[in-house]
């Protein structure tokens, strides 16, 4: 019976992992579709599409699925029309979150996001309720390995970006720039250093709250995880970071 139970647990875990993988693929395909619809189908001429394809390849999304998503988005194939929406809300202890979604039904998504916030000790707010706590910037991220920070920094100075910093904890180099300069800055870094790990518009907190309380960390982690488990939610940004208790 122990062996049977263990096998059942393995099957259960594999099923959960497969479901997560399938959901991730769905979100990647959705981003590729929207990116292709908004611009040219050639990734070299459409940076958002290029970034979406790069992200999809990192997650091993099959090539045929990528090509089909682009073809469906740019052809005459009837398909879903997705709307980009940003929801703002407060988490436990007054923390602030911005939830980015791609949805084909805004009423359904708003209801689901509101329910998750309320169930996890937060509340969904109105537009502008927390975004004033953030700066809206262009964000470009490279892995530290393989890219020299001094070279990135020098290039950033030439391009007059807002900031170039090292995130040793995550092993990343992070560049931020003005929204109006994002396109040219992203393309200039791509031309010199190749495709970044991440390149998008982002809400960066003006004051980052460091949280070390384990109970609060668990609550916030549960909230963010459940939000990101929603099929329509692409990603979540917040004004907090978790640190080890002293």
UniProtKB/Swiss-Prot annotation:
Q: Does the keyword Membrane apply?
A: no
Q: Which SUPFAM superfamilies match?
A: YebC-like (SSF75625)
For this protein's source organism, the top of the classification is: Bacteria, Pseudomonadati, Pseudomonadota, Alphaproteobacteria, Rickettsiales
Q: What is the native source organism of this protein?
A: Wolbachia pipientis wMel
Family, per entry: Belongs to the TACO1 family.
| Pfam families according to UniProt | TACO1_YebC_N (PF20772), Transcrip_reg (PF01709)
- Give TM regions: none
InterPro entries in the record: Integrase-like_N (IPR017856), TACO1_YebC-like_2nd/3rd_dom (IPR048300), TACO1_YebC_N (IPR049083), Transcrip_reg_TACO1-like (IPR002876), Transcrip_reg_TACO1-like_dom3 (IPR026564), YebC-like (IPR029072)
Name its cellular compartments: Cytoplasm
The protein's name is Probable transcriptional regulatory protein WD_0484
Q: Which GO terms describe its cellular component?
A: cytoplasm
Its keywords, alphabetically, are: Cytoplasm, DNA-binding, Transcription, Transcription regulation
